[in-house]
Amino acid sequence: MRYGTNTNLSSLLDQKVDILQLMHDEDSAAYAWTIRRTCPAYVETDIHDNLFSAAGTRARGAKITIRTDSRLTLHEAMRWNGKFLFLTSIELSEQRDRQELQAAVCESVTLTAKPQDRTGRDALNRPTAVDVPGFTFPGVLTEKYFRNDAEDVYRAELQQRVLVTPKVIMLRAGDLVQQDTEPPYTVRQVLDLDPYKNEYVIERSWEA
């Protein structure tokens, strides 16, 4: 950082960031990031990448300084100069007048979840299929790897990615996830031990 810890905050915080919170609209079945507040900040991109995903590739890192916000948690995110900042750590300065944040510079996209039927019980306690409605939500797609499978009749290309979502977005293996009109992905693996986010290994295949 170009300033020391004793630098006057007014001269340090010469930029602006939007602090984003996740909101849910029940009528439209949509989760979306909305601005909680806009505040002065100092932001610089890091020379080191940020390992924000346990299963995906790294992203460019950023360091952010803001005045102390007691409500801020890693469940939130930020937007700076049109860039989405996925928060990965929050530290309070020794003077307790500012917070030093680490973030990954990512692209947040809107996706549609199409959950598969769940198994429930009817009035007679017999297993029955329970329809789960679809919903839209924001997520970050990061690359995992590509693989080519040779089959008897045709060759299929299998594309795997890692989907990183806010913690409240709960998917199961077998659920479908789609971005715009692209072919949908199928959730293959759920990684949900992190207290602030969920990760899903998703894949799709098509004839090459």
Regions from the PLM with identified roles:
Residues 154-173:
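A conserved acidic, glycine/proline-rich C-terminal tail/linker
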Residues 173, 180-192:
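Low-complexity, intrinsically disordered Gly/Pro/Thr-rich segments
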Residues 74-76, 172-175:
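Loop/turn positions that initiate beta-strands
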Residues 1-71, 84, 88-159, 191-208:
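N-terminal disorder-to-order initiation segments that are Gly/Lys/Arg-biased
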Residues 67-72, 166-170:
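Short, surface-exposed secondary-structure edge patches
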